[in-house]
């Protein structure tokens, strides 16, 4: 028994109250000579056919082989004597009107068969049924205890349709519909087909246990329905099965969608899609296409396949970029391909990020190698050289580059490339801090470098004068880097203080200036050559003081000339004095005009780096000494007396590399002797020589 389901009552309980008065008690006795085998419960779907197999045996009593045997199937509560059977082989007996032509006794009771065929089962047919056999005069028996129950169920079974999974457009196809409920002697159902892919003549019904349909699909038939109908009864009981046609076609309707940081996907439209993302973001690219059979999907960056799918896999292919990098920029193409064709869609991905690795590339004259400089770098450049600064950074979109110097914007050398700054031959005014700015919507950076201008020594001096202790000389030089100064007396290097107290050297320095004063005590020998030399890595200069005529230098109150010179020398000096007075007056007028412009270049003898020098330098602004330099200041009423005023430049050259040895050049400049404390001695004179080596500014 099935729990919770109502079970049919036993035939004895149903038939006994009705049949007992009719049949008498004897007919209900269970005689072992009578037996019947039948299925206790027979299910049948409504409208279908079922065969109830049945076998019986009865005693050979009152009949022989020629005696006809009659069998009757009665519905429960029907009197065998007065009621109509639902099926019988007795032609003289009327059957129940509702079961006529549907219930048929197909078995031969004379041969021990009582099988029953039930066609087009109806809901009202559900009941108990028992069999009665009659043969001869004595066999009259109803098998009440061997009845069966006919269970009529709802029709849930559907036909099976056999069709290829994918139909080729333009190619004939055969479809079969089968309903697996066929019994021998049961009538065949009626089959029919409906669908958009079929012409009306294809929908005519046919009667069989299966149906075969042939047609030629077209691409338009894809995703349409095809239905097989199976009809079983005159009351319209039927079953049907619908299949969806899958006609092959090339990929179409390719769609790309994206999602940022695990957000919902956003579908993108356009022939070529442009997408901007920021560096470091999470990005998921999705690609889907409609095709039959399913297409193989792939993501391609440039010509490199990043991922692909199988036709039997998911219909959507995803590509995840975790922490997008700058190198992920490029054209991503989704391709969908099957045996009938292909389709693709492109996406241009631009990864945006602020300036990175900002640096300055430096190109200097006579150098083929570029230097990469970072922030805070000090850049030494030789005066007169050309300089090219290129600001370089990585960003997307490109950052806006600009140059400033001490906070003031510097115009680019090439407007089309604002990151390039070209400086003309470097001068002192170019010294300072240069800053490249890289401005970007996502952030900005800057890099600064300090430009220092280097140049070789510019010698000022030596200049000498008599003082109470002896001869006092001073020498100064300006250079970058700061120069070194040394004194030579003849071939002897003078450093510090002499142990005998014959000389004393006092050095000093301030910024680019180097100063040195020399005090000589005692008598000086004839053929005196006193030399001051300044040098740094870029070159050297030197100046010398000579004693022109032999004799002994003495400190006195005037300039005495030896009797050996005679009256001719006196006349010559008188002539020179007149000439000098005239020159000094002219030079003083010129000096006043140049004083304001040349105050920042102190020099007693005039800087060599000017490229030329006026013959008249006395009283000019360059007579101002450098910081810390020892000078002689004329007293009130004293006049400077010019004894020698000759200046020559020989073989001046442009800057040359420091490792190339340059020839020395001798120059002559003015010697000033103050009349208050003159140098005197028999036949004495002073001459200044400058030796320049290394490189000379243009």
Swiss-Prot record:
Pfam families on file: I-set (PF07679), Ig_3 (PF13927), V-set (PF07686)
Domain-level remarks: Contains 1 copy of a cytoplasmic motif that is referred to as the immunoreceptor tyrosine-based inhibitor motif (ITIM). This motif is involved in modulation of cellular responses. The phosphorylated ITIM motif can bind the SH2 domain of several SH2-containing phosphatases.
Protein family according to the UniProt entry: Belongs to the immunoglobulin superfamily. SIGLEC (sialic acid binding Ig-like lectin) family.
Upper taxonomic lineage: Eukaryota, Metazoa, Chordata, Craniata, Vertebrata
Keywords: Cell adhesion, Disulfide bond, Glycoprotein, Immunoglobulin domain, Lectin, Membrane, Phosphoprotein, Repeat, Signal, Transmembrane, Transmembrane helix
PROSITE patterns: IG_LIKE (PS50835), IG_MHC (PS00290)
GO MF annotations in UniProt: carbohydrate binding; phosphatase binding; sialic acid binding
Signal peptide coordinates: 1-27
Name the UniProt record assigns to this protein: Sialic acid-binding Ig-like lectin 11
Membrane topology reported for the UniProt record: Single-pass type I membrane protein
Keyword Transferase in record: no
Glycan-modified residues: 55, 90, 262, 366, 375, 497, 515
Organism (species): Homo sapiens (Human)
